[in-house]
A protein has these predicted regions:
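Beta-sandwich interaction modules
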Residues: 382-394
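Short, structured beta-strand segments at or near domain termini in extracellular proteins/domains
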Residues: 411-421
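Conserved, mostly hydrophobic/aromatic
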Residues: 56, 98, 153, 290
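Noncatalytic modules at the cell exterior or secretory-pathway interfaces
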Residues: 393-407, 412
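Surface-exposed ligand/attachment interfaces on beta-rich extracellular proteins
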Residues: 135, 324-346, 360-363
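Surface-exposed substrate-engagement region within the catalytic domains
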Residues: 122, 128-280
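Short, surface-exposed beta-strand/strand-loop-strand elements in extracellular ectodomains
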Residues: 359-377
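Long, acidic (Asp/Glu-rich), low-complexity accessory segments flanking structured domains
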Residues: 1-48, 61-90, 95, 161-165, ...
Length: 421
């Protein structure tokens, strides 16, 4: 946010965020698929560019414990404030929007929500934005300059007075309850897409927009697999390298935004994947706040770039190769000629793989392996299940080739970028 003018209203900034920010644990391995919303810790999220966080708490006597539903997240609000304030000390040009909500019934004998909150706020008063510090007309939409170095509470609890911005006053899309089947998943996507388009048009009307990419099947997810990770990714498993889940093999005009392969087979589209692609197409110039489960660097950076700035990461094109949609004649796996990655820029921390398909295909449906051409011996696989915007460890070799592609109907190009700080 350091490169954004201080006079910019919060409503005019595109802000990456997380839903269920501290939801890192299930009560046991049995419910983790349902309960968990994130893999990154709070500090990792902040350092990745997240600036909206969603804090759910339970009152325990005179303190807040972090909860998701009835599941304890093995942290307390003091931990949250310690990490957030340290981040703001290290990055004083930033601001953190923090939704604060009572998640479950309090422990017997606990203080009121407001009493507990004030205990935390009073100790750390200089790091909480005070709505009384700006004119009444600006209290629901302050400028970035007013809030730099501060936590802005998006108040989702009742109290005698307002300690931040009224959460219920935001323009919110939060269709979080999702049934089974492609129609339900697609309805969630349309809600996201419509809200993005509305935000893009109305971002300067003084209203802060919040778009939840998150969703769940709730308890029914144990039967229908509509877990938060599936809603986010549309994939067959929680593994980030897994393939998109197939809906049906025959061609159809239904679910038109969902990805298809060359035979017309239709796959589920994850909200994060579809959202990232829409943001990268260029029609959306402003997103408001996006709260996602399991956001990756592609989504986070796509939101940040809408502000006309970039994250601290740099992408340097180091190689590219054209591949056929299936193995070359006489080849078992190989679908391209050899290409090399033989020189990595200083500071390279990983590689990013970008798929540029033909007009008939979608990058999100294509995946492939990368193999090494071994002159005297059996070719080996360096990377498996590479998909659009996958990130991998960086290894050099002069004889890589694309192998075993799926999901493409014709030639596609693979661009390889070195990611540096």
């Amino acid at each position: 946010m350091s490169k954004i003018e201080g006079s910019t209203k919060i409503s005019e900034i595109s802000i990456p965020g997380t839903h269920g920010t501290m939801a890192l644990h299930g009560a046991s391995f049995l419910d983790e698929n349902l309960t968990r919303n994130q893999t990154m810790s709070l500090s990792q999220q902040l350092n990745s560019g997240i600036r909206y966080v969603d804090m759910r708490v339970k009152r325990v006597k005179d303190s807040f414990a972090m909860y998701h539903g009835v599941v304890n997240q093995k942290a307390v609000f003091e931990d949250v404030l310690k990490e957030t304030i340290q981040f703001l000390k290290d990055h004083p040009t930033e601001t953190i929007l923090m939704r604060l909500k009572e998640e479950t019934n309090p422990e017997s004998g606990s203080l009121s929500f407001e009493e507990i909150f004030l205990k935390y706020k009073n100790v750390n008063a200089s790091y909480f934005w005070d709505p009384n510090s700006v004119p009444t007309s600006d209290r629901n939409n302050p400028t970035l300059g007013d809030t730099r170095g501060k936590i802005v509470i998006l108040q989702n609890f009742t109290s005698a007075q307002l300690y931040g911005i009224d959460y219920e006053g935001l323009n919110i899309q939060d269709k979080f309850e999702i049934g089974s089947g492609p129609d339900e998943i697609y309805t969630k996507w349309i809600a996201i897409k419509n809200h993005l388009q509305n935000t893009n048009i109305n971002f300067n009307n003084g209203k802060i927009h919040l778009n939840h990419f998150s969703g769940t099947g709730g308890a029914a997810a144990f039967l229908n697999n509509v877990y938060p990770w599936f809603v986010a990714s549309g994939k067959e498993s929680r593994n980030t390298d897994s393939s998109p889940k197939l809906i049906q093999t025959n061609s159809t005009n239904a679910w038109s935004d969902f990805p298809r392969d060359r035979n017309g087979q239709v796959y589920y589209g994850g909200m994060n994947t579809l959202g990232t692609e829409l943001l990268q197409q260029g029609a959306i110039k402003h997103s408001g706040i996006i709260a996602a489960d399991f956001p990756g660097p592609g989504l986070i950076d796509s939101i940040i770039k809408l502000n006309g700035i970039h994250s601290n990461e740099k992408e340097i094109l180091i190689s590219q190769i054209s591949s056929e949609s299936s193995p070359l004649s006489g080849q078992q796996n190989r679908s391209s000629q050899n290409f090399k990655i033989d020189s990595l820029p200083v500071g390279t921390k990983e590689l990013k793989w970008v798929i540029v398909p033909s007009e008939k295909d979608y990058p999100s449906t294509i995946s492939f392996n990368v193999m090494i051409d071994v002159s005297l011996g059996i070719d080996s696989t360096r990377w498996k299940n590479i998909s659009h915007e996958s990130r991998t460890e960086a290894y050099t070799n002069t004889k890589y080739y694309i192998a075993s592609p799926i999901g493409a109907t014709s030639k596609f190009t693979v661009k390889i970028y070195a990611i540096t700080n």
